[in-house]
């Protein structure tokens, strides 16, 4: 399929996707019933969309195009109410978190969907292992060239986005010692990590043509980059965050990305170059492994900076943009989080350290989601 032309969209508008866990009490293991839930809610959703993801234990909530995070929060709240009622009617529960702490990937059923079945054929067991749960944020752009500039700008802050949203310390019944273990699942995919370097939309079109020669890439949706342009929506899509435990934190993360995008495209503070990515995976690893306690390294100077310090600096820089976008409350909440030094991964570990079980942890996550 040829790459579509870049659809011009209103700059800085938002679209947010949350991949949710469908769990089966009292075991609180993952259920395989997302199709049943989707059928139950399809005529009751008035804003946004509830749809499949890769496996039958995943449920995706997606907003419509939103002006600001307040509108997005309203749409998510409406969807959440309908989904929680349908889940209760079918004796299921819903929660966030980047991984389910003890599910076995071998039990996961890939959705009966042509695209997902083709992906299963291409990638085999890796697709079942990709039963992990992330938040994706789309930001509108006026042109393809703006999208490429924005993608490179946002890529500088991938460690910050990962550390602030880290919520996947447990996997397959084990403490991984990572704050965010979810991104590691995609390391075996040939398109893992950052997009290959291009400097403008014309070069991106050439890149996509080259990738399509592999026959594994039919559309943008087949690419698993950390951040990717979405020409059919006219957006840049940030894909590195774990699904938060609460709607409020998900909305705050979207506000952070919207405000950062506004600052980047308005101020144009960087002259991007390929060398910017030289230490990308090292810095990304620091955020995944250590969360806010990670240390990032500047590829141009060799300077090393605590991620906490650099995140506070980013929040300060984008504060005027956040005000213009109606996202000041999000930046203030994230500032408090950074100062406290806590992320959701640490709260999960604290629960287990205090004697809680992994089953109890999932139960608690369901209560948190329903109560937010």
Swiss-Prot record:
UniProt organism field: Escherichia coli O7:K1 (strain IAI39 / ExPEC)
SUPFAM superfamilies documented for this protein: Glutamine synthetase/guanido kinase (SSF55931)
Top EC class of this enzyme: ligase
Protein name: Putative glutamate--cysteine ligase 2
Pfam families the UniProt entry points to: GCS2
Description of how the protein assembles with itself and partners: Homodimer.
Classification of source organism: Bacteria, Pseudomonadati, Pseudomonadota, Gammaproteobacteria, Enterobacterales
GO BP of this protein: modified amino acid biosynthetic process
Entry-linked InterPro entries: GCL_type2/YbdK_subfam, GCS2, Gln_synth/guanido_kin_cat_dom, YbdK
